[in-house]
């Protein structure tokens, strides 16, 4: 078997694991939005990489002629030591630089980041992902590009699960 055939065979059934960058196209009553599930792990470098990815992706035009928003839904980064608050607050510049238009946040360290955001970028902050979940589900709309990211212990997967349940018919996973 040729090397290209071996490579093709290995990749045919590959799926990005949940929480590790899987993208889903979910549908609201007004149209689809893209969900990027990065809920498994987070550190300052991976947060910045996720924001950079979102910043490079276009938000599609909706049937109503408007464009979606870039939304970040963020949970605490754990095990950062005594500089944790500073490292969380430092994310603000990257959010702005990558054209994130609305930020939802959960956890005590993300409160530091949330309070440092310009008011126009502030969505909602809550103490936990479970408390934040209904606000995110209500806020997403057609054309939006939504990234959910946080350390596994911050349980941001709850928000991914809620979005998938509420907007239950994925158009595609990629």
Describe the residue ranges of each PLM region.
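ATP-dependent carboxylate-amine ligase
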Residues: 1-174
């Amino acid at each position: 078997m040729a090397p290209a055939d071996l490579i093709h065979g290995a990749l045919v059934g590959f799926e990005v694991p949940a929480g590790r960058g899987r993208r889903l196209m979910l549908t609201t009553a007004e149209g689809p939005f893209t969900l990027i599930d990065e809920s498994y792990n987070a550190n300052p470098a991976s947060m910045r990489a996720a924001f950079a990815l979102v910043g490079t992706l276009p938000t599609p035009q909706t049937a109503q002629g408007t464009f979606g928003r870039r939304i970040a839904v963020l949970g605490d980064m754990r095990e950062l030591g005594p500089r944790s608050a500073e490292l969380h607050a430092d994310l603000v510049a990257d959010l702005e630089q990558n054209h994130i238009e609305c930020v939802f946040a959960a956890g005590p360290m993300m409160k530091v980041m949330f309070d440092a955001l310009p008011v126009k970028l502030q969505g909602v902050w809550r103490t936990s992902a479970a408390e934040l979940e209904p606000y995110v589900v209500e806020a997403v709309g057609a054309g939006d590009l939504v990234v959910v990211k946080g350390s596994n212990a911050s349980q941001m997967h709850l928000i991914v699960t809620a979005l998938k349940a509420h907007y239950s018919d994925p158009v595609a996973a990629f």
